Amino acid sequence: MKPPPLQRTIAVFAMGLCLIITNAGNARTQNTLPADTSSTSSFKNAVVFLDKLEKLEPSPYWPNIQPALFLQNLKTNIRQPLSPYQGRGTNFCGYGAFTYLLLKDDPLGYVQLLLQLYQKGRAEYAGIMFNPSNRVKVAAGNLKFKGILDIRPAEQMWYLCLADHFKGYLNIFNRQYDPGDEDLFWASVNYAKFNRMLQKMLHFKVQAKGGDIIRPHTGDLFGYITQKLATGQVILFINNRLVHKKDHTKLKLGVPTHFIVLDEITKTGNTITLTYWDYGGKTLMQLTPAFLKKIIFGITHCTKKEPDAS
């Protein structure tokens, strides 16, 4: 039996705070790169590959996934790479942002990975073996009342597999999936876990500043983000409850809960304009420098890994 939500929240964040303080001296990290130095694919590669697939047979591993919807979901994400959507009320935000970056990095690899998972019940990518639990396999395709995610079984499968495989301190007391856990700590993504996913699976150099409680120290925040965006991808870890006055998450504390992938940042007078990916599309937000500083807890900078010249 799981402990009551309030007790679980207090226990998890007490432990999380200890872990964060222990690592506070290493707020800026440069992660080790994956061993694979091959070039990544293009959207054209993925489209050509998918166009050869007219239909899929039902999978014996995923009883609640409809083959036609699964294939359509893959084609939608390749033809409309902004479309990955984490679902209403879930804790899949980090996995949605990660998937958007994976699609930009290796779209063909994404398609082949999800097809292998669907057809064989397990799959390997970047040296990582995904072998989801039977509970996850039953849940995929059966999530309801999550908005358009309801009819996107490939994304349901993928987000559940990511949550099942990657664990952080927020997942300590809830490691095994039960129905409804997509909305709870089982699916949560803390900042270090998100960066670890990028490090292990994508062809990126990853630098990170900040944390789940400790804000990044950058001096001129606008200048720092502008500089990083000029040389690579920038992901911001923000307190979305300050931006949107609504119950976006089950987490009721004043902490960051949301990952956005920045597309553009400009400044006119005392107004900063952000354009970024989240929730399956592009969003524009205007705010003051003080409010920007208030909502940002993490800044992740990703640059494409260069192929080995040898």
Please tell me what each predicted stretch does.
Residues 93, 100, 240-243, 282:
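Solvent-exposed loop/turn segments at secondary-structure junctions
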Residues 148-195, 216, 234-240, 254, ...:
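Non-catalytic membrane-recruitment/adaptor modules and adjacent regulatory linkers
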Residues 39-174, 228-235:
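Active-site nucleophile-adjacent alpha helix/oxyanion-hole segment immediately C-terminal to the catalytic cysteine
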Residues 1-30:
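Bacterial Sec-dependent N-terminal signal peptides
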Residues 209-271:
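Active-site-adjacent substructure of cysteine-protease-like catalytic cores
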Residues 197-209:
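Acidic, glycine-rich loop-and-strand cores that form catalytic or ligand-binding grooves
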Residues 28-44:
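Short N-terminal segments immediately surrounding and downstream of signal-peptide cleavage
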Residues 250-257, 266-310:
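Cys-His-centered catalytic/binding microenvironment captured across papain-like cysteine peptidases
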